[in-house]
């Protein structure tokens, strides 16, 4: 009798477990999409892809690359597209980026949209011109204490057809990077030693994608060039992780491979005859160089152009000889370097202070019509904010203040 009760108990327990498993599998089948779905793009092109991923990556796997400066984190809002069917309801992570009208029209962040069923989406036509390359590191020296000039060589016969001020996306695989293994030239090692940056380790368990403005201009073919600043934890914040992509970039050596996607962009020069004033700082040098070289060397522009760049000290200023030469060769161009913290060894006799103050005191204060100029800027957030406020106080309209948020 006891044995029979035990057997019945085991049978009942097994039946309950099997029933629960069946319920879970049924629920999973309803909630987790499997199999392939069809995504119709712009009412014309169709791609078949496995369900379950995010729309941004699903499109990328099919060779359609939407811009995503934040690498799919839902913060930059550059991967927006229209999802007219099959996308479900807008998520709370998307709502701050769109108006109610945008939501009604179907705008979504593709990095937040799950691919669960057949979908209809609309993307900008220029997206179809975006390509992917596996590039080779040609060089990666420091040009300032915390900034590398990364030059990548494209595959033989390939070229990035971009406009000055454009950007591409770099992809880093999962990796572990030790700062102690970085190649930092002797003249720049002082602050690395002072702040003991060698102790940091960047460990990344998944693919990382970030956007960087190009420092080369369209006539410099066969390569892409960047000015990339290391994003190490601030002093006293050792518990914060280092920048994932910048740490990876600082570890790259000649001959290494890295994937590049692009081109993208919206920080383009206006086609007018207005005076152009460029303002930069830090790694914001990249799009400044691209624009200025394009205007003077490719377009042979006769517009009045000036460039105002801020750095801490002489050691942190780069491309100075290139700009000196441009100034000698072009009577319509002049450039000004201002140091906020010149060192005794600099023997600096030039302009000092923060670049927005120098620009105002040295030029805009007595300019007859600053509101008629076009201002292009890229630099650290505090610099950008200070320059924008100054320009607004001078009566410059927003459409004449162009900002690249990538280069700081």
UniProtKB/Swiss-Prot annotation:
Compartments (UniProt record): Cell inner membrane
Record GO biological process: sodium ion transport
Family matches, as InterPro entries: 2Fe-2S_ferredoxin-like_sf, 2Fe-2S_ferredoxin-type, Beta-grasp_dom_sf, Cbr1-like_FAD-bd_dom, FAD-bd_FR_type, FNR_nucleotide-bd, NqrF, OxRdtase_FAD/NAD-bd
Residue ranges occupied by any FAD-binding FR-type domain in the UniProt entry: 130-270
Protein name: Na(+)-translocating NADH-quinone reductase subunit F
Protein family membership: Belongs to the NqrF family.
Subunit structure, as described in the record: Composed of six subunits; NqrA, NqrB, NqrC, NqrD, NqrE and NqrF.
CC cofactor note: Binds 1 [2Fe-2S] cluster.
Residues annotated as transmembrane: 6-26
GO terms of molecular function: 2 iron, 2 sulfur cluster binding; electron transfer activity; metal ion binding; oxidoreductase activity, acting on NAD(P)H, quinone or similar compound as acceptor
Organism field: Marinomonas sp. (strain MWYL1)
């Amino acid at each position: 009798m006891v044995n029979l009760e035990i057997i019945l108990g085991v049978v009942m327990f097994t039946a309950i477990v099997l029933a629960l498993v069946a319920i879970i599998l049924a629920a999973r089948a309803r909630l987790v999409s499997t199999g392939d779905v069809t995504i119709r793009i712009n009412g014309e092109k169709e791609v078949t892809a496995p369900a379950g991923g995010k729309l941004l990556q699903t499109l990328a796997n099919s060779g359609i690359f939407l811009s995503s400066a934040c690498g799919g984190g839902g913060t930059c809002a550059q991967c927006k597209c229209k999802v007219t069917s099959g996308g479900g309801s807008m998520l709370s992570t998307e709502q701050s980026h769109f108006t109610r009208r945008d939501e009604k029209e179907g705008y979504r962040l593709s990095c937040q949209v799950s691919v669960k069923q057949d979908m209809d989406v609309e993307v900008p036509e220029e997206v179809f011109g975006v390509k992917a390359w596996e590039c080779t590191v040609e060089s990666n020296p420091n040009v300032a204490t915390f900034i590398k000039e990364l030059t990548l060589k494209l595959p033989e016969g390939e070229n990035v057809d971009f406009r000055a001020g454009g950007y591409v996306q770099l992809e880093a695989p999962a990796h572990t990077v030790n700062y102690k293994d970085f190649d930092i030239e002797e003249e720049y090692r002082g602050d690395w030693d002072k702040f003991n940056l060698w102790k940091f380790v960047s460990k990344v368990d998944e693919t990382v994608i970030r956007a960087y403005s190009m420092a080369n201009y369209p006539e410099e073919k066969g390569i892409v060039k960047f000015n990339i600043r290391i994003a190490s934890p601030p002093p006293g914040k050792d518990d914060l992780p280092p920048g994932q992509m910048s740490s990876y970039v600082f570890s790259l050596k000649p001959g290494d491979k890295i994937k590049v996607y692009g081109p993208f962009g919206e920080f383009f020069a206006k086609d007018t005859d207005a005076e152009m004033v460029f303002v930069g700082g830090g790694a914001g040098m990249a799009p400044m160089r691209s624009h200025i070289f394009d205007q003077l060397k490719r377009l042979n522009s006769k517009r009045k152009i000036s460039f105002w760049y801020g750095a801490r000290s002489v050691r942190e200023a780069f491309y100075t000889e290139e700009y000196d030469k441009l100034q000698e060769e072009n009577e319509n161009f002049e450039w000004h370097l201002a140091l906020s913290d010149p060192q005794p060894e600099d023997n600096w006799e030039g302009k000092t202070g923060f670049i927005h103050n120098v620009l105002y005191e040295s030029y805009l204060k007595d300019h007859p019509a600053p509101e008629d100029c076009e201002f292009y800027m890229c630099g650290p957030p505090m610099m950008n904010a200070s320059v924008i406020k100054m320009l607004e106080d001078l009566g410059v309209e927003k459409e004449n203040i162009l900002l690249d948020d990538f280069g700081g």
